[in-house]
From Swiss-Prot:
Pfam families: ATG7_N, ThiF. GO terms for molecular function: Atg12 activating enzyme activity; Atg8 activating enzyme activity; identical protein binding. Keywords: Autophagy, Cytoplasm, Protein transport, Transport, Ubl conjugation pathway. InterPro entries: Atg7, Atg7_N, Atg7_N_1, Atg7_N_2, ThiF/MoeB/HesA, ThiF_NAD_FAD-bd, Ubiquitin-activating_enz. Residues 268-293 are annotated as: Disordered. This is Ubiquitin-like modifier-activating enzyme ATG7. Homodimer. One of its GO terms (cellular component) is cytosol. One of its GO terms (biological process) is protein modification by small protein conjugation. The keyword Iron does not apply. The active site is at C536 (glycyl thioester intermediate). E1-like activating enzyme involved in the 2 ubiquitin-like systems required for cytoplasm to vacuole transport (Cvt) and autophagy. Activates ATG12 for its conjugation with ATG5 and ATG8 for its conjugation with phosphatidylethanolamine. Both systems are needed for the ATG8 association to Cvt vesicles and autophagosomes membranes. Autophagy is essential for maintenance of amino acid levels and protein synthesis under nitrogen starvation.
Length: 673
């Protein structure tokens, strides 16, 4: 008689599995290429009826089962399995390079190790009979997965043969119900004895005690069959037969191939010859899955064409950032960055560059505020605009810039708001309700965002956002340009920051200053009475992108610092030598960066908060809290009002008195006898 032939098991990795594998590799494994366990399910074969050309003409067609690996392969708790499916555990190895994946010796070692583990399990009461191995290389950038499944099967020697034909099984529903009640989805094969309705079941490891040897009961094995062929059982039976023969000395048995519907079959099997009495040798094992072409070679799953382009873009944006955590900065908190809501006040040169770099860091929520339109001089310096945006008087900058951001990356939530910012020294009428509405709208925007960028082209336009940012405790990053110089700074966070002590250096208890803390005069109208070269932004073209990049990097460093907005000022020397855990993984978090292109130099500067500052002092904040817009109206209309509120006018008078008192001193008398 010819040896029994088995139908190979087919793998069925789902798109959800590849997505889960990519996420697990990117977010958890990173460079770790250790093999790890995964779960899958074996689904049995079934037969279905299909209609032919005539309505009353049908055919019975067999469909093979398979090993299905789904999106829950990495989860300890699996969802509900289909009826008659069996849960199995396998080994996954994700290689870091395609060259490692192609190395045949590495795959052979993994296969041999899995076979050894299976043989060792035969000495326990829970033999592993359905192991599988998956080796893969994931090209996460192109969404291409090279993979190869193996289903190790031990070769029985002598071979098993059929004693007759496979026949239909009576009482199959009783057997199926018994399998569900005893083993649920955890066992692919079990022992059976008795007749309905008095059937009994037991695990294979109980073979020596389950049957009554005095009555010469025939061993009956039920296994979930993945083959739909009439005379060829599925691949999983090979290990069952080897185990029963090698471990329990079984030389003949009845096998019931449990399949879907009414297609289950049974047959009597026996060894073709008595087992050898020679010393046992390690059994031969086979099981690498063949390519659809019939060759023993890996397969490729290309998910790129199947994926939504928008989702592809989102995953690609995150990919480069997550790769930073693999080797360079494992402590980088990308979720904190992506969840930060950024408000950009100014959609000009600085605003365009800042927005682009924020998207590069994975920031998903960006709001741009501007009141101007795109002019013909803008597109060459402001990368979010094109020539067509300048036509017919020009499109509004903020909504246009937001639209361009979404064209670059559809996953960004970009909003554009046309809004003018009221400024000190720019009077408003007493009946101008629109200004009050603009103030309320601006405050609502500041309140609803986490970080505020001041990117306007005048000094006084930054005053109101400075006040609002301090009031609501936001991270405020300021960037200003000169012809060949720039300033990038973050504002202090208020009273809370002043109480923070920093042992490794930085400013003292007063906290960090704001844009106006070095001024001894209130901001005033700097836009009127200017020549053309003063009205236009005249600066070296490379200064803006440099300043914009530093502004964004400063924000990211603040977000990564354990103290966040309250992070004290650091210098490179203190950040490198500090043993404190309260540092940013990105390095030092400075207060101010002052750059000069003429000298190719950038300086780190620290500035304490000024208690009479016109932008962030308690005098200003308390006055705004008390009088609201009435206070702002006086600031806009009265040139010296801020100086009175903060006490700068008294400081002037005291200084003048000191100077007057020093006029009578003889400075040349020092040292005379």
């Amino acid at each position: 008689m010819a040896p029994l032939q088995f139908q190979p098991l087919a793998s069925q990795p789902t798109p959800a599995f590849w997505a889960a594998l990519a996420a697990h590799k990117l977010n958890h494994l990173k460079l770790d290429d250790s093999h790890l366990p995964i779960t899958a399910q074996i689904e049995p074969a079934k037969r279905v009826l299909i209609n032919k050309e005539r309505v009353d003409d049908t055919a019975d067609v067999g469909i093979d089962g398979s090993l299905v690996v789904g999106g829950d392969a990495f989860e300890a708790e699996r969802g509900r399995l289909p009826p008659n499916a069996v849960s199995v555990t396998g080994t996954l190895k994700i290689f870091n390079t395609i060259e490692e994946f192609k190395d045949t010796s590495a795959k052979k070692r993994l296969f041999d190790d899995l076979v050894s583990q299976m043989l060792e399990s035969f000495d326990t009461d829970r033999p592993v009979l359905n192991p599988f191995l998956l080796v893969t290389f994931a090209d996460l950038k192109k969404y291409v997965y090279h993979y190869w499944f193996a289903f190790p099967a031990l070769v029985s020697s002598p071979a098993w043969v059929m004693d007759g034909e496979f026949m239909p099984v009576d009482e199959i529903e009783d057997i199926r119900n018994l399998a569900q009640s005893h083993f649920q989805h955890n066992t692919a094969a079990f022992l059976l004895k008795g007749a309905a309705p008095h059937l009994s079941a037991a695990p294979l490891s109980s073979c020596s005690t389950f049957y009554d040897k005095t009555q010469s009961e025939m061993v009956t094995v039920v296994f979930h069959d993945t083959s739909s062929l009439p005379s060829n059982p599925g691949w999983g039976l090979r290990n069952v037969l080897y185990y029963l023969s090698a471990k329990h000395g079984i030389t003949s048995l009845v096998v019931i191939c449990l399949r879907g519907g009414s297609s289950s079959t049974q047959a009597s099997l026996s060894l073709s010859s008595p087992p050898s009495t020679a010393p046992a040798k390690p059994p031969q094992a086979v099981g690498w899955e063949r390519h659809p072409s019939g060759k023993l070679s890996p397969r490729v799953a290309d998910l790129g064409p199947m994926m939504d382009p928008t989702r592809l873009a989102a995953q690609a944006v995150d990919l480069n950032l997550k790769l930073i955590k693999w080797r360079l900065l494992p402590a980088l908190d990308l979720d904190k960055i992506s969840g930060t809501r950024c408000l950009l006040l100014g959609a000009g040169t600085l605003g365009c560059y800042v927005a682009r770099i924020l998207m590069g860091w994975g920031v998903r929520n960006i709001t741009l505020v501007d009141s101007s339109t795109v002019s013909y001089s803008n597109p060459v310096r402001q990368p979010l605009f094109t020539f067509s945006d300048c036509l017919n008087g020009g499109l509004p900058k903020a909504p246009t810039a937001a639209k361009k951001l979404q064209e670059i990356f559809p996953g960004v939530n970009a909003q554009g708001v046309v809004l003018g910012i009221p400024m000190p020294g720019h009077p408003i009428s007493s009946s101008d309700d629109a200004v009050e509405k603009d103030v309320a709208k601006l405050e609502a925007l500041v309140k609803s965002h986490d970080a505020v960028f001041l990117l306007m082209d005048s000094r006084e336009s930054r005053w109101l956002p400075t006040v609002l940012g301090r009031k609501w405790g936001k991270v405020v990053v300021n960037a200003a340009l000169g012809f060949d110089s720039f300033l990038v700074m973050r504002h202090g966070a208020g009273a809370g920051a002043r109480r923070i002590q920093w042992d490794e250096g930085g400013v003292g208890e007063k906290g960090l200053g704001c844009y106006y803390c070095n001024d001894i005069v209130a901001p005033a109208d700097s836009l009127s009475d200017r020549t053309l070269d003063q009205m236009c932004t005249v600066t070296r073209p490379g200064v803006a992108p440099i300043a914009a990049a530093m502004a964004v990097e400063l924000l990211i460093s603040v977000l990564q610092h354990p103290l966040g907005v309250h992070a004290p000022a650091e210098r490179p020397d203190t950040a490198e030598t500090s043993t404190s855990t309260k540092t940013s993984p990105l390095g030092c978090v400075p207060h101010q960066l002052r750059g000069q292109m003429y000298q190719w130099k950038t300086q780190i500067v620290e500035g304490e908060a000024f208690d009479r500052c016109t932008g962030c002092s308690d005098y200003v904040l308390n006055e705004y809290e008390t009088n609201g817009f009435a206070f702002l109206r006086r600031v806009f209309n009265e040139k010296d009002y801020l100086e009175k509120v903060t006490g700068l006018d008294e400081l002037y008078r005291e200084s003048e008195k000191v100077i007057e008192g020093m006029e009578g001193l003889d400075w040349d008398s020092e040292g005379e006898e």
